Amino acid sequence: MAGHSKFKNIQHRKGAQDTKRAKVFTKLIREIVIAAKTGSSNNPENNPRLRNALTAARIQNLPKERIDKALNSANDSSNNENYTEIRYEGYAQNGIAIIVEALTDNKNRTAAEVRSSFTKYGGSLGETGSVNYLFNHCGVIQYPINIASNEDVLEAVIEAGGHDIISDDTTHTIYTDIENFSKVLEFLTGKYGIPEDSYIGWIPLNTIIIDDKEKAEKLLKLVEVLEKSDDVQKVFGNYELSDDVYEIIQGEP
């Protein structure tokens, strides 16, 4: 995983250009419902996906009553809402590979929205499997840099069964195999508390540097529009903004 120290830059994560809080909550609730419905148990101790969903909800301060309502909804046999997990893959301008993960109750609607977004911002939606070979599918756990030294966190990660850690000026980013994700997350949560973020995602094997402000803004606009869709859970790309472009964009109102 070397070369991904600017992880926040690469993925264009939560910040000023992210979706509104209400939309974040909608996505969290949907993930809780689908995890409870499709998992082997409604007990998070026996359902890793549900446990991960509940951890993500706590990280984002989703109110407990809304979590309980989501769990009750999943257990309600009269609830006919059925969500399908879909992964869309395509290219933005300049050959940037994009992966979009979605949960939808209407595949045609979601596909049309995603395709329209790609087209509007100069990209093209491809077939599933067209770009995923450019990424590593793995678990990601992030803690603030001041939680402990890189050496201490690395020791904990090795003990827990994780396979890599990248530390930059603000964040320790831990990577795990998917099958070990829940175990590593549980171990680190017991040692360091709830992380800033944790999820299973697509991390680029190599990144394309964007050093042009206009190209960067168009790419980030595509990511922003995709993330605003209620059906879209996460967006990943194999890009990285150059330091100069990143600072310019961060400095804009």
UniProtKB/Swiss-Prot annotation:
Family: Belongs to the TACO1 family.
Protein's name according to its UniProt entry: Probable transcriptional regulatory protein RPR_05505
A GO BP entry: regulation of DNA-templated transcription
One GO molecular-function entry: DNA binding
Main subcellular location: cytoplasm
GO cellular component: cytoplasm
Alphabetical keyword list: Cytoplasm, DNA-binding, Transcription, Transcription regulation
UniProt source species: Rickettsia peacockii (strain Rustic)
Source taxon at top rank: Bacteria
SUPFAM superfamilies, per the entry: YebC-like (SSF75625)
Subcellular location: Cytoplasm
